[in-house]
A protein has these predicted regions:
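Conserved acidic/glycine
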Residues: 1-57, 256-349
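A broad, low-specificity signal marking well-ordered, structured residues that form hydrophobic/aromatic
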Residues: 2, 101, 231
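Short clusters of hydrophobic/aromatic residues that line enzyme substrate/ligand-binding pockets
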Residues: 4, 103, 111, 252, ...
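A generic structural signal for short coil/turn motifs at secondary-structure boundaries
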Residues: 12-13, 49, 81-82, 114, ...
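Cofactor-binding active-site loop characterized by glycine-rich and histidine/acidic residues
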Residues: 32-35, 44-166, 185-188, 193-200
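Glycine/Thr-rich phosphate-binding loops of Rossmann-like dinucleotide-binding domains
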Residues: 37, 82, 241-243
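A general secondary-structure junction signal
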Residues: 76, 235-237, 319
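Glycine-rich ThDP/TPP pyrophosphate-binding loop and its adjacent helix/strand module
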Residues: 119-296, 306
Length: 349
């Protein structure tokens, strides 16, 4: 497994001081974003939310390894990847508040978040083949969890990329849980990375709580992908929080003996301690980064609140040219409900 923290001094890594500080800055931003999002969701300010605490190093490290024109295919828990890739936090807030038009950002090479499990994997393989036909140089980074490897779309995307040499890095964040199912009940394979052999591609493992290691590994894998050699990366990390705000993880992992050990390896605390020991950052830098992150998020919340709420009837648009009878009936029922109730006065918490 590829690892930097605990095994190499900073000057022995292949990461510049500027990049190391940028990684830390985005890890603080994304941790603060996650904390703020949970608090806002609990107030009923936005819809259900999938927390990613514990996975900041994995996602931020991968995002920073991408070239400017590389395409990101995120899953529903990839908010840190999106933020580090350049998606404004206000856009993610607005998406969670029901604005479908903020599902993706036209100024950043990021596909919309895929909520159905694994559907983005064949999309990335297809986009990679389109890149081969066009002769461009960008690569695709598609992100998914360990649970997605049990889906048929995982097989289809991996097989397609392996056969045709699509420029794709398949980035699996193995956070230990597919909702409530532990990895050992997800697959009989020795590891997720070992699955790559069946598709004729390289499979590698990286310490997903080490942003320097993730950065180095994903950067090198993207270089290979651009040469026609797709790679499967298994980033070993841990989901510290619930699957979503609708989940109660105490029902299935209270007795998990690995929890204390993973919390000792909290990626943000671990990285901050390492950078201080190596003389890369000091207390003043850390405090300034925290203040910047809090100011940015406060402004993002204000910006999101300044946008008018979406029309509830929009949920029926852009799927069918002509609504089928059952949806037509549902739309009429919604319209009748809205004429009798002010949505702003309803308690939807």
């Amino acid at each position: 497994m590829h690892r930097c923290i605990g095994e190499r001094a900073f000057d022995e890594t292949d990461v510049s001081t500027e990049e190391a500080r940028a990684l830390y800055r985005d890890m603080v931003r994304t941790r603060r974003f996650d904390e703020r999002s949970l608090a806002l969701q609990r107030r009923g300010w936005m819809s259900g939310y999938p927390p990613f605490k514990g996975q900041e190093a994995s996602q931020v490290g991968a995002a920073h390894a991408m070239a400017e024109d590389d395409w990101l295919f995120p899953t529903y828990r990839s908010n840190a990847l999106q933020l580090a890739r350049g998606v404004p936090p206000s856009d993610i807030f607005l998406f969670r508040r029901g604005h479908a038009e903020y599902h993706s950002d036209h100024d950043v090479p990021v596909f919309p978040q895929a909520v159905p499990i694994a559907t983005q994997i064949p999309h990335a393989a297809g986009a990679g083949m389109a890149r081969n036909y066009s002769g461009n140089d960008e690569a695709m980074l598609v992100c998914f969890g360990d649970g997605a490897t049990s889906e048929g779309d995982f097989h289809e995307g991996m097989n397609f990329a392996g056969v045709f040499g699509a420029p794709v890095v398949f980035f699996c964040e193995n956070n230990g849980w597919a909702i409530s199912l532990p990895r050992e009940r997800q697959t009989a394979s020795e590891s997720i990375a070992a699955k790559a052999d069946a598709y004729g591609m390289e499979g590698v493992q990286v310490d997903g709580n080490d942003p320097l290691a993730v950065y180095e590994m994903v950067r090198d894998c993207l270089r290979s992908a651009r040469e026609g050699d797709p790679v499967l990366v298994e980033s070993l990390t841990y989901r510290q929080g619930a699957h979503t705000t609708a989940d109660d993880p105490s029902r299935y992992r209270d007795e998990d003996p690995d929890i204390p050990e993973w919390r000792k390896r909290d990626p943000l605390e671990r990285y901050e301690e390492y950078l201080k020991e190596q003389g890369v950052v000091d207390d003043a830098f850390v405090e300034s980064v925290r203040e910047e992150a809090d100011d940015e998020l406060a402004a993002a919340v204000t910006e999101a609140e300044s946008v008018d709420d979406p029309d509830p009837e929009d949920v029926f648009d852009f799927v069918f040219a002509d609504l089928p009878p059952q949806l037509d009936d549902q739309k009429a029922e919604l319209q009748d409900f809205l004429t009798r109730h002010d949505p702003h006065e309803l308690d939807l918490s």
